Amino acid sequence: MAVPFRRTGKTAKRKRRTHYKLSNPALVLCKETNTFTLSHRVTKNSGYYKGKLILENKPSKAQKTTDN
């Protein structure tokens, strides 16, 4: 079984681990609702993508029960 010749020091270990980091998500401003959303995605609250209506909002189950 292979064994390291020398022990890895704290500094070398920490320098190697500094590159593991998260990047900021690409957010864009929705023209319809003026809220930030992820780019290249349909907005959840309005259903618009690139200024066009893609998804129509369906009434939730709670609203359906109160309407009857």
Curated annotation (Swiss-Prot):
SUPFAM superfamilies: Zn-binding ribosomal proteins. GO terms for biological process: translation. Pfam families: Ribosomal_L32p. The keyword Ribosomal protein applies. Keywords: Ribonucleoprotein, Ribosomal protein. GO terms for cellular component: large ribosomal subunit. NCBIfam families: rpmF_bact. This is Large ribosomal subunit protein bL32. The gene is rpmF.
